[in-house]
């Protein structure tokens, strides 16, 4: 049976009683607050990558991906006011999710997409209040792809997508949500990553 979940209204309204932090085991490795609403899922997904400072790839194989999904899928669906079981993920699913993660990484770092192409599919439905909702489709990695691209779409319409960034410190590379008033941050933590990069530059110059 197809697993479905209401993503929420087209304006991206999340359940007001839910905390997006509960769906962020990967992001919590960095010690940061989650991104607002459903965008927390996208940031969380990107922060599953290997980090020399914070741990292994949480999508490294099917078992790791399944463990990650067991936390994230129910928490995300609760954030959106519904209830689902996490999709089953195999080694193949984990590999496809890593490919998807690379694609999203490219978008954040300015990779040119090129010709328009299909990246996923969702279903539209009316909820009990008459709001249009998007519903992830597919099984395994396709379910996550559908949910993640839906959240990207909602954040682009809400004007928050441009605040999702990748730290410029190569040793960190975490995905962070820029909360600065002018959206000018380039480090996830200006107190640690900023000085590290400044010191590296000084060493290269022999200062």
Per-range role (PLM):
Residues 1-177, 206:
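Short helix-coil boundary/hinge micro-motifs
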Residues 180-182, 200-201:
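C-terminal structured interaction module
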Residues 183-195:
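Cysteine-rich micro-motifs
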Residues 195-207:
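Short metal-binding segments enriched for Cys and/or His
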């Amino acid at each position: 049976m197809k697993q479905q979940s209401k993503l929420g209204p087209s304006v991206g309204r999340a359940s007001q009683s839910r905390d997006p932090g509960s769906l962020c085991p990967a992001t919590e490795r960095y010690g940061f607050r989650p991104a607002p609403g459903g965008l927390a899922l996208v940031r969380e997904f990107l922060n599953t990558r290997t980090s020399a400072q914070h741990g292994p790839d949480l999508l490294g194989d099917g078992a790791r991906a399944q463990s990650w999904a067991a936390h994230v899928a129910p928490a995300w669906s609760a954030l959106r006011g519904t209830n689902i079981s996490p999709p089953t993920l195999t080694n193949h699913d984990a590999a496809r999710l890593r490919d998807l993660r690379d694609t999203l990484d490219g978008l954040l770092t300015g990779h040119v997409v090129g010709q328009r192409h299909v990246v996923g599919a969702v279903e539209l439905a009316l909820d009990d209040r008459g709001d249009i909702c998007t519903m992830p489709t597919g099984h395994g990695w396709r379910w996550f792809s559908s949910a993640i691209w839906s959240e990207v779409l909602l954040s682009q319409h809400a004007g928050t997508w441009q605040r999702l960034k990748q730290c410029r410190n190569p040793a960190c590379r975490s995905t962070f949500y820029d909360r600065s008033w002018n959206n000018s941050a380039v480090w996830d933590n200006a107190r640690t990553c900023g000085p590290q990069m400044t010191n590296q530059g000084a060493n290269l110059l022999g200062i």
